[in-house]
Amino acid sequence: GSEMCIRDSHIPEPDNLFDDFSYRGTAIREQTLTLYKNLSHSILVGDPGELGELSPDQRKAWDAYRSKFSKPYQAMNLNWSDQSRELSRFKYQSLLKNFLASGAGIDKNVGRIRAFLQENDLADNTVVIYMADHGFFLGEHGFFDKRFMYEEALRTAFIVHWPGKVEEGVVNDRDIVSNIDIASTFLEMAGIEIPQEIQGRSMVPVLEGKTPDDWRKTFLYTYHELANHNVCLLYTSDAADETC
């Protein structure tokens, strides 16, 4: 199927796959997003702890599936800790093929949802939105993951099908919207009053091609310190590892 076509393909590399940070600022020189150094085996093939939850038959099927894609790496005869360009290229191909295979699976299942709406006469009365909470580096600058403030991590997918409201095929790459706008947008779509204290603004006029003159032109992004999500870290005289 589509996944095997992806697996058998060679994905073109971005021009800046081997970006040089040696002459740049501290933040980019000390980031932990590089393919050659930070993309581990477990990220590509799954954490061993997670695989331990599989039944023997499931594990056998998983190992057989993965072996088809590990053979090229084994043929390279490189250590996973090696920082050569050959291993970086292998990691890039593996990352992109995993990503594209996942995207193909999403596309297939979005199609199933759309088909259900059509078959049950719901398509004209349903808003379908595909979105993500962040962008992702796919080899650009030699990176994977997110967080670093480059275009690839800041831009996110936000695709809207709203019959009678949003013109098909129109792309808006000018106006700045944010995930804080989503709640207000959904409320207006549903005809519900938007509370004054809510953050963000409804994107409905933007989606309709009627962006207000006072729509935001700038925004601030920060990501710093100890990035332990949902954990409050307290500094002490000895360390910063106590939680509250």
Regions found by a protein language model. Name each.
Residues 1-8, 235-244:
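Single conserved hydrophobic/aromatic residue that forms the stacking wall/gate
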Residues 164-166, 226, 243:
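Residues that cap or initiate secondary-structure elements
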Residues 2-177, 189-197:
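Active-site-proximal cap/lid insertion segments
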Residues 134-140, 180-183, 188-237:
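C-terminal cap/loop subdomain of S1 sulfatases and analogous C-terminal strand-loop tails that border
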Residues 157, 163, 183-184, 239-240:
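Proline-centered helix-kink/hinge sites
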Residues 110-112, 184, 244:
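Hydrophobic side chains within alpha-helical segments
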